[in-house]
């Protein structure tokens, strides 16, 4: 699969949806946004408990642990699902808000779930939604589907004091909202690019990175102390959050604009140097230095459209291949397992998948099958990262985001 130029217009028209305007596939009826004050609402407790999320070990030689639980963001519903990772036991769903997308779990066991209605807070030990923080950004009526407004990517500061959520504004540029995790208040709103699929944080917490799909860019933000916020200049480094720079990430160029498939989706932050790794089409891996805005492009081998990323504790990069843009030239869905030295293994997957999370011991990848376009399924594929063997775990409702709980 070679892309010296963009694919022919006919192919783009037939398949355009990865980044274009809303289409008929998003047939879910819109919902009316609930009225209420600009403060978090709460939900009634749910019975049941699960293990608290803990820091990951540093290597992949850790002895086998007790079975984990997966926390799935059910993009096709208004729930998160607790799914036993060993395939035993019954899934447990908790209502969080319409069309949840991204999920991040802190060391205190609280999960932060980006929904169309607000940033939901779930106690993973009691399995209850304890709050939902409304966005300050106006996103229109609450809806479902690929282009719905509301939260997408979400991440936590290393000290757990702030949550960062990328908010999509249909037909416009998005925002990054900063939430104080103690007071459950939005403390700053900053402008970012269109459709902020992914939010990542530097290992030391000194920078936040927002990958905006529709505008081919990464916004680099100095989170400061998490209060207020500005578009450029001033504050930062302990003051108000500010935008440091915007970096175009387009190894194939930006021709085609919203109709192009060749956009960034998700990034992974390499702990050794803080660089962002952004995969494209199973051919090119952009290695971006966010401190300078400079990047290098490295070769990949899966030859398929790519979305979700994750890093294992020992530094292997996992990349989800959703399937071909052009079936005549491209390969099918897959999981790329890329070693720190750049060598790759490609594990075929059954049908499109969206995102991935690794087990803390680095032995297993959990890949969600709730793709944002057609072809999605209700479940997760577990991949043994040593043997490449796969195992299907049914559960969730069009799950997109995933976190591993112990």
What residue ranges belong to the model's regions?
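Predominantly soluble domains enriched in secretory-pathway, periplasmic, or organellar proteins
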Residues: 18-406
